[in-house]
Amino acid sequence: MGERLLESKKDHQHGEILTQVPDDMLKKKTPRVKSCGEVSVGHASLNRHHRADTGHKPYEYQEYGQKPYKCTYCKKAFSDLPYFRTHEWAHTGGKPYDCEECGKSFISRSSIRRHRIMHSGDGPYKCNFCGKALMCLSLYLIHKRTHTGEKPYECKQCGKAFSHSGSLRIHERTHTGEKPYECSECGKAFHSSTCLHAHKITHTGEKPYECKQCGKAFVSFNSVRYHERTHTGEKPYECKQCGKAFRSASHLRTHGRTHTGEKPYECKQCGKAFGCASSVKIHERTHTGEKPCSSNTSKGQGEKIA
């Protein structure tokens, strides 16, 4: 009762009210910027972060209670752009943030951040193959499929199968041509948020993921995780047919084709088919006359592709 909830300053010349959250209100508890999920300790960092997140300027002229962002579906109005976007996605079913681990999609950055904790490797469900621990049973079952090769989700268009529904959903966009993730720098569009994120780094040159062993930096979490296995010698993906082990699920899949005879990569020039993408690229040079850079092909380097 009688508590000062909002500090307001009247601009008599323009007849508008300038608002700012008061210091004593922010000190009551650890503040949270809900538009992006980032937590800030202290009112100063919260104010700075909120302005960076929303684009608002300190003491910006704005009519008190103004809500310029109106939902086209239910006409609900919002004063904050991130809240407005998240609300509209609730109507459209849009979930623009994809988890790289399991393919599950989320409506906001804060939601996917919370979800990623589930993949942290600290949980009660331990994988018998590689020892990784998962937070919940559903994630454990999805993870286990990377070892067993089980792919229960099949594309109705081409019959290609996937280990989880999120991957199938992204794959189906290759048939529909849907590319909902657009780069703000160059306008290039992508099938998934993961591809967009990897592309954006080509503009910035940023490599945020660093190897704890040698300090080498990478553009994606999956890349640094694969690289770290070169230090540990870990090869958690084992072929059921011959027992050969690999550092990544993709290498196991490629190897598996030597047993099944599957050759999904076809030369555009002559139609010859291959078991892996690198083999078809090498073959295509016989048509183009292109020669690989000699500096990358010194004696004793490289690996023969079977």
Swiss-Prot record:
GO terms for biological process: regulation of transcription by RNA polymerase II. Pfam families: zf-C2H2, zf-C2H2_6. The modification Phosphotyrosine is found at residue 209. A zinc finger (C2H2-type) spans 31-53, 69-91, 97-119, 125-147, 153-175, 181-203, 209-231, 237-259, 265-287. The keyword Endoplasmic reticulum does not apply. It is found in: Nucleus. GO terms for molecular function: DNA-binding transcription factor activity, RNA polymerase II-specific; RNA polymerase II transcription regulatory region sequence-specific DNA binding; zinc ion binding. Keywords: DNA-binding, Metal-binding, Nucleus, Phosphoprotein, Repeat, Transcription, Transcription regulation, Zinc, Zinc-finger. Residues 287-306 are annotated as: Disordered. SMART domains: ZnF_C2H2. Coiled coil: none annotated. May be involved in transcriptional regulation. Belongs to the krueppel C2H2-type zinc-finger protein family. This is Zinc finger protein 625. The gene is ZNF625.
